[in-house]
UniProtKB/Swiss-Prot annotation:
Species assigned in the record: Ehrlichia chaffeensis (strain ATCC CRL-10679 / Arkansas)
Protein name (record): 3-hydroxyacyl-[acyl-carrier-protein] dehydratase FabZ
Main enzyme class: lyase
Lineage, broadest ranks: Bacteria, Pseudomonadati, Pseudomonadota, Alphaproteobacteria, Rickettsiales
Keywords of the record: Cytoplasm, Lipid A biosynthesis, Lipid biosynthesis, Lipid metabolism, Lyase
UniProt function note: Involved in unsaturated fatty acids biosynthesis. Catalyzes the dehydration of short chain beta-hydroxyacyl-ACPs and long chain saturated and unsaturated beta-hydroxyacyl-ACPs.
InterPro entries from the UniProt entry: FabA_FabZ, FabZ, HotDog_dom_sf
Superkingdom as given in the UniProt entry: Bacteria
Gene: fabZ
Amino acid sequence: MQFNIQEIIKMIPHSYPFLLIDRVTACTPNESVTAIKNVTFNEPFFIGHFPGNPIMPGVLIVEAMAQACIICTMSSMQNYSVYLMSIELAKFRKPVIPGDTLILTVNVVHKRKNTCKFECHAHVEGTLVAEAQILAMTKQNEA
């Protein structure tokens, strides 16, 4: 499965400037997702991080990974929400700068009842720039 931005907006409860997924190029529901974030000079976070030396904040790379995890889960569910429970083993290996295309891959490595553990990686031009493990839970929305 692939998703364009209009389909992504229906799955993720975020909006500009906090929606950090532009496109999903591959999705196997509840198993894996490959998503793209086009990093442009116009990103609002570059104003202060850092003037004259713009670098995408690591916390926003992890947020993009978490949003890819939401898509992995929500692509097969309706009337549910996904909540972040923990981030572990986050590592930032190279800076992400304007003009980069961030390729995010998330894979479910453990699932139990309403929780999923994801192994997440971010690459730019084939080079690993960040990685983390994310634990998330699903909860049915109240009517």
